[in-house]
Amino acid sequence: MSHRKFSAPRHGSMAFYPKKRSARHRGKVKAFPKDDASKPVHLTCFIGYKAGMTHIVREADRPGSKINKKEVVEAVTVLETPPMIVVGAVGYIETPFGLRALVNVWAQHLSEECRRRFYKNWYKSKKKAFTKASKKWTDDLGKKSIENDFRKMLRYCKVIRVIAHSQIRLIKQRQKKAHVMEIQLNGGSIEDKVKWAREHLEKPIQVSNVFGQDEMIDCVGVTKGKGFKGVTSRWHTKKLPRKTHKGLRKVACIGAWHPSRVSTTVARAGQKGYHHRTEINKKIYRIGAGIHTKDGKVIKNNASTEYDLTDKSITPMGGFPHYGEVNNDFVMIKGCCIGSKKRIITLRKSLLKHTKRSALEQIKLKFIDTSSKMGHGRFQTPADKLAFMGPLKKDRLKEEAAATTAAAAAATTTSA
């Protein structure tokens, strides 16, 4: 009787079964942080879009460690986070079967990008979504109904959540449908939460009002899709010896004769990637303001530091590959992040209470790399490149063409 001589742990985890494509593209938040009434009312989640990665140089703050007060280089991910718009409020009551929604209140005006989310084909539709909800704000009966709904929230509801959508038009994507999600309000009493939700209807919320510097957050999203993959790539099983008949990247024995079926615990080929996952404990290194105007001047230097005073934007030279420019507010987190470029990532406040020194460490950035990510970039800004390369031939040709055009225009004017 043949059998294995040695035992070994199984390859891969079965905790994520079934390994199939996610049913949703946007990361779903299945749990919110525990409420604390002593804190002011605040949102617990935000929507961001993955732009790309770069690296930073910072000074380590680890007393007792060999690298304390020394410079360390770390990889970071940049997520573009344009302001979100609050368009509704939902009140939940506690039942023996869990939370159940009691009342919904929608804002009077919903943007086109938000209403597009509720249609499969916007151009063939009648575009009448939320017309009844908006009419409530104009007639007397509707206003009474809205006031009654808010009174129900105050009297019966234990959990208040707001409905907010991203502003997809502010980022350089072809998509026109905004992403809509429910976000739980934490902090304060129920009266404070209802008041906050009512005051912020149709108003933008900045990411800086939700998260803070050096905060630990969670990233919820869908991983990068890999398609149909073999068992070795999908489960990281051991390759068979070189002389094995009919392939090496296989499982040699997929089970016993009886029971006469393949067990669900056996590694098999199939879908890899595009799975819904939650990554916890991502530290925020910087929350940067987008390109804005202040005192009549356009402010772009959101990648400069106290040590690097260069006037530069977080967008690297040539833009982030397969994404482009980051012109809105952004969040820079340590390390990598799930998903491909342009993938929507739901950022959530951490569910845990952090006590580790690495989580409480204060981050002081010295340098943010903005060189080209298409290759081995050498220059941080176009000014650096111009100073090193000198005047280029194409620039000289443009100047000559402009001079020729100006001379021809002057000659025409003189002759006339």
UniProtKB/Swiss-Prot annotation:
Pfam families: Ribosomal_L3. SUPFAM superfamilies: Translation proteins (SSF50447). The keyword Cytoplasm applies. One of its GO terms (cellular component) is cytosolic large ribosomal subunit. The keyword Ribosomal protein applies. PANTHER family: 60S RIBOSOMAL PROTEIN L3-RELATED, LARGE RIBOSOMAL SUBUNIT PROTEIN UL3. This is Large ribosomal subunit protein uL3.
